[in-house]
Swiss-Prot record:
Cross-referenced InterPro entries: CDK, Kinase-like_dom_sf, Prot_kinase_dom, Protein_kinase_ATP_BS, Ser/Thr_kinase_AS
Catalytic machinery residues: D139
Residue stretches making up the Protein kinase domain: 22-297
TM regions (residue ranges): none
Physiological role: Catalytic subunit of the CTDK-I complex, which hyperphosphorylates the C-terminal heptapeptide repeat domain (CTD) of the largest RNA polymerase II subunit. Involved in RNA polymerase II transcriptional elongation and pre-mRNA 3'-end processing.
Species of the source: Encephalitozoon cuniculi (strain GB-M1)
Protein name: Probable CTD kinase subunit alpha homolog
Root EC class: transferase
Record localization: Nucleus, Nucleolus
CDD domains in the cross-refs: STKc_CDK9_like (cd07840)
Biological process terms in GO annotation: mRNA processing
Pfam families associated with the record: Pkinase
Length: 329
């Protein structure tokens, strides 16, 4: 079984699972995570995520995801309905079915500024709630944002999520490469919630451009693309960066900052927010509470959120104590 991260508390006792009562229809997703199957129960449709198992039992990724999802309760976070088991022993996590993910939606539609703000506000609200629980998602990307037919967004895939610790030491190399913050690209294992903010900046930019802005095939190429858009990485733009292992290992190019000009061509109102999210220095990167409170949302998205009772980020006092996290499952 893969090891837990330093300071991470995981309960390895058996999960409560009910008998499989869902009719499988077809596979709708497949990858390193396993399979996602469209299923039916009565007239309702569901998504069944097959749980990965190892010789010693359930993987740490699966245990972590179930624990975290059972602690969640927010309209912008996918709901884990139950865990079911088949007679042969296969285990599935049951979720509501969503017809789209944001990645496919972006590539199939020319999104309006109103749609972008509406969707992104919901994502930011969800991340605000996640962070209020003392959790970093660590895999925010457009493919992990699910959409219903009314463009209501739900954040999914919490296999890489984990609770923050007092030591602040975590596994390096997390987050899908194209959405990975520069501090992780440079080998930091002492990162913060700011890594999720960088990913949010990538998602918002992606919605405007119609494609992901940084598409490196290796960490070095990814860094070069980040530098080309966000400027040179040095002690002026990122104090302390020379202490990171990757800064010594890579010969980084020099470049002026261009990201503001790129976004201004699509929506001038988004320039300031994108600039603050895609800040090279994680200590100066905007917080998710500040994202939610940004003037970027003053007109369309905030009006929509207010009608749904989601005005502002109202979850800051909802962090779990360390003692409660031990029994989060």
């Amino acid at each position: 079984m893969e090891p837990a991260e330093e300071g991470e508390i995981l309960a390895h006792r058996r999960f409560t699972a009910t008998k499989m009562e869902y009719e499988k229809i077809r596979i709708i997703g497949e990858g390193t995570f396993g399979q996602v199957i469209l299923a039916r129960k009565g007239r309702a449709r569901y998504a069944l995520k097959k749980v990965s198992k190892e010789k010693e039992g359930l993987s740490v990724t699966t245990i972590r995801e179930v624990q975290v999802l059972r602690a969640m309760g927010h309209p912008s976070i996918v709901r884990l309905i139950e865990v079911v088991v088949e007679p042969g022993g296969d285990i599935y996590m049951v979720f509501p079915y969503f017809p789209y993910d944001l990645n496919r939606f972006i590539r199939s539609n020319k999104m309006t500024c109103s749609e972008i703000k509406h969707i992104f506000y919901q994502i930011a609200q969800g991340v605000c709630y996640i962070h209020s629980k003392g959790i970093m998602h660590r895999d925010l990307k457009s493919a992990n944002i699910l959409l219903d037919q009314k463009l209501n967004a739900s954040i999914a895939d919490f296999g890489m999520a984990r609770y923050t610790t007092k030591t602040g030491a975590y596994t390096p190399g997390m987050v899908t490469l194209w959405y990975r913050a520069p501090e992780i690209l440079l080998g930091s294992s002492s990162y913060t919630y700011a890594v999720d903010i960088w990913s949010l900046g990538c998602i918002l930019t992606e919605m405007y451009l119609g494609h992901m802005i940084f598409q490196g095939s290796t960490e070095m190429l990814q860094l070069e693309m980040v530098i080309h858009a966000c400027g040179s990485i040095n002690e002026n733009s990122y104090p302390g960066v020379q202490d990171l292992p990757g800064f010594r290992n890579f010969r980084l190019p020099q470049s002026p900052r261009r990201i503001e000009g790129i976004i201004r061509k699509h929506d001038a109102s988004a320039v300031e927010l994108v600039s603050k999210m895609l800040c090279l220095d994680p200590s100066k990167r905007i917080t998710v509470e500040q994202v939610v409170g940004s003037k970027y949302f003053e007109h369309e998205a905030r009006r929509d959120a207010s009608s749904a009772g989601l005005q502002g980020c109202s979850y800051r006092e909802d962090r779990l104590s360390l003692s409660k996290r031990k029994n989060v499952d």
